[in-house]
Regions:
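Glycine-rich phosphate-binding active-site loops on the catalytic face of alpha/beta enzymes
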Residues: 31-35, 133-158
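N-terminal active-site wall of soluble small-molecule enzyme domains
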Residues: 1-24, 36-39
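Active-site beta-loop-alpha junctions enriched in small/polar residues
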Residues: 12-14, 32, 55-57, 83-87, ...
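Conserved anion-binding
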Residues: 26, 32-99
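Alpha-helix-loop-beta-strand connector modules within alpha/beta enzyme cores
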Residues: 1-7, 42-49, 98-113, 158-181
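Catalytic cores of alpha/beta
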Residues: 15-22, 60-66, 121-139, 147, ...
């Protein structure tokens, strides 16, 4: 309420959807639950927007079929989120699949956002991957930010400081302009076509 930023909360079970819906702006279905069909059915009946993260080993077709499950429940407020897939590479937490952006935009009408924080697991990779996501046409970004990442209770290694986040946003504005996109006035909500 103080910042005006929307709150996204991960819901883990179908039984928790109505409770979580009372306290959040957007319901998140995490990567591990992308094929939890009872949960997809429940968020499909919810009145709040749903952020559907891609699973570690989920193909584009499987991800879009999971999205269809939500849409079939009556909830058309659906956002897809690329957050990295599992590959043989071990340096990063995951491999961020930026190819997913134009593929999903071609195959679906749904907006796609990118989470380079979870997609890489390393703060120094967040900015370049976020900028690449904007250039590739992402509708928005999810970025972990913390005033002191070394003291964060979770996700510190992938969190940007406020200063680094400001630098990222300066870069986002520049890349968005270069690819003829606009950054929303409430910048953390992302890039608009």
């Amino acid at each position: 309420e103080e910042t005006g930023l929307p709150v996204i909360t991960e819901v883990m079970t179908a039984e928790d959807v109505s409770l979580v819906e009372e306290y959040t702006d957007i319901l998140q279905v995490g990567a591990r639950n992308v094929q939890n069909f009872s949960l997809l059915d429940a968020v499909g009946k919810a009145q709040k927007p749903v952020l559907l993260k891609r699973g570690f080993s989920t193909s584009y077709e499987e991800w879009l079929l999971s999205a269809e499950y939500v849409l079939a429940g009556g909830n058309s407020q659906l956002i897809l989120c690329e957050r990295g897939i599992r590959t043989f590479e071990t340096y990063t937490r995951n491999t961020l699949d930026l190819e997913a952006i134009p593929v999903i935009k071609r195959l679906s009408h749904l907006p796609i956002v990118v989470d380079p924080s979870h997609g890489t697991g390393k703060w120094h990779l967040v900015t370049p991957m976020a900028l690449a996501a904007v250039a590739a046409g992402a509708h928005g970004l999810l970025i972990e930010v913390h005033p002191n990442p070394d003291r964060a209770l979770s996700d510190g290694a992938q969190s940007l400081t406020f200063e680094n986040f400001q630098r990222l946003m300066d870069g986002v504005r520049a890349v968005a302009k270069a690819v003829d996109k606009k950054v929303s006035p409430l910048a953390p909500q992302g890039v608009r076509d």
